[in-house]
Amino acid sequence: MLVTASGAPGTAALLHALRDNGEREVRLVGTDMSERSVGRHLCDAYHHVPAGSDPSFPDTMLEVATRESVDAILPQSSFDLEGLAGHVDRFPMPVLVSPVDAIQRSNDKALTYELMHRLGVPAPAFFRVDGAAGVERAAHELGYPDRPVCFKPVFSSGSRGFRILDPTVDRAHQLLYERPGAVAMRLEEALELLPEGGVDLLVMELATGGERTIDGIANGGEIVLGHPKTREAMRAGLAMYFVTLDDPELMRLASLIVGELGIEHFFNIQLVGDYVIEINPRISTVVYQEDLNLPYLGVKRALGEISDDELRALRPRVRPGRTALRYFDQLEFDA
């Protein structure tokens, strides 16, 4: 099995789950754009590949997958999805990606929010702009400085490029007591840094409240297996604590989104408070159970070894309250 972006934060847990599947031995092939990927050490074979946005990425992945005789390809990074999806019919093995249209509408946050509003799903008010002048106009339209707003690139992954515009931010406190990379700043500071033109930006109402996600496996029209979970204890842009939830309303909302977008294989839908803020048509952090191995089940489905009905029959195994605590680890080797 080939796992892309094998330097991603969840890689070690994912690889362990794929190996510890209780059915068979699995040979793992990792790829990453970084030479310092942990996949180099945790996989049975490793290949340094171009970035997912590089035009040569699909051909390189096809070459690696063919040379290694893998049975399936599991992408971890949002940046790998579209390049693979556009060439999926060239691969002799299953590639666990959604159709190109579903990926594009999910990764373009403006299109995502437009869809949410059309479906009646709560999502932030927003403006799609480019350049400092556009950000300034949109921020004031959304209520700045009376209330904080936020922005991020239309095309991004996770918290990359996300900033909160807050006129009350204590810059002295940030300077003296916070780690570098604080996400809050004043509008005028952002305007000094932003060029005119440049990438499209999404200026948004700031969603507040607890974070939750719905994760699972979809069949292009509905969720066949999945569950909601909390997303807590942020550190360096990553959540470090997750608790499985029993929330039928969140599952209903996720089913509506999955069906409208036509998502296939793995998905992750993220909420802050009541607002949907992100749709990721890929695998994300998993709360693992010894009797419910979502990544392995998703791969089995792609290989035709388990049916959607058989996956639906596993839904009662989801254990609300099951908790995952993420932590930092390290390994040593002689260079």
Where are these regions (language model features)?
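Active-site nucleotide/adenylate-binding loops and adjacent lid/helix of ATP-dependent enzymes
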Residues: 103-201, 220
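ATP-binding N-terminal substructure of ATP-dependent carboxylate-amine bond-forming enzymes
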Residues: 1-99
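Short, charged, surface-exposed secondary-structure boundary motifs
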Residues: 40, 56-60, 104-111, 159, ...
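ATP-dependent carboxylate activation and anion-phosphoryl transfer catalytic cores
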Residues: 68, 233-237, 241-335
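Preference for protein termini
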Residues: 1-31, 69-72, 76, 128, ...
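Phosphate-binding site of ATP-dependent enzymes
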Residues: 175-259, 273-275
